């Protein structure tokens, strides 16, 4: 979350995705004055990994500057499903608490073609 660009909301989010080969890619949220042009930390991490040729992920960890747990938005859940439908979503908070969910718990009826 340290590198997040969040001048409008002040809500900074960071994510790290673990690839099947053991490599890790990080991402942060990047806001834009036109909110629709903003990008979440989870998708930033996924897109960085995919752009480097990685397409199999085991888990993603997410943390924010907020007081509680930050769950991935619906768009991020669907993007994650594309690459890790059996994967884990690890949530951390500023107090050191951790929660772990299977992605299928957070997106029980994912869209697919």
PLM region descriptions:
Residues 28-44:
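Compact, glycine-rich, soluble single-domain proteins
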Residues 12-19:
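Short beta-strand scaffold segments in enzyme catalytic cores
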Residues 1-3, 52-113:
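C-terminal binding/interaction regions
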Residues 45-49:
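Short, charged beta->alpha transition segments
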Residues 6-9:
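Short loop/turn motifs at secondary-structure junctions and domain boundaries
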Residues 18, 31, 40, 57, ...:
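Short, electropositive, low-hydrophobicity segments enriched in small/polar residues
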């Amino acid at each position: 979350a340290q590198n997040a660009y969040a001048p409008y909301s002040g809500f900074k989010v960071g994510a790290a995705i673990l690839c099947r080969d053991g490599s890790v890619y990080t991402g942060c949220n990047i806001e834009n004055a036109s909110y629709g042009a903003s990008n979440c930390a989870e998708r930033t991490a996924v897109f960085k990994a995919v752009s480097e040729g990685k397409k199999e992920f085991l888990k993603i960890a997410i943390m924010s500057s907020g007081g509680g747990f930050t769950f991935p938005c619906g768009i991020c859940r669907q993007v994650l499903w594309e690459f890790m439908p059996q994967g884990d979503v690890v949530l951390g908070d500023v107090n050191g608490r951790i929660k772990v969910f299977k992605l299928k718990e957070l997106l029980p009826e994912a869209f697919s073609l």
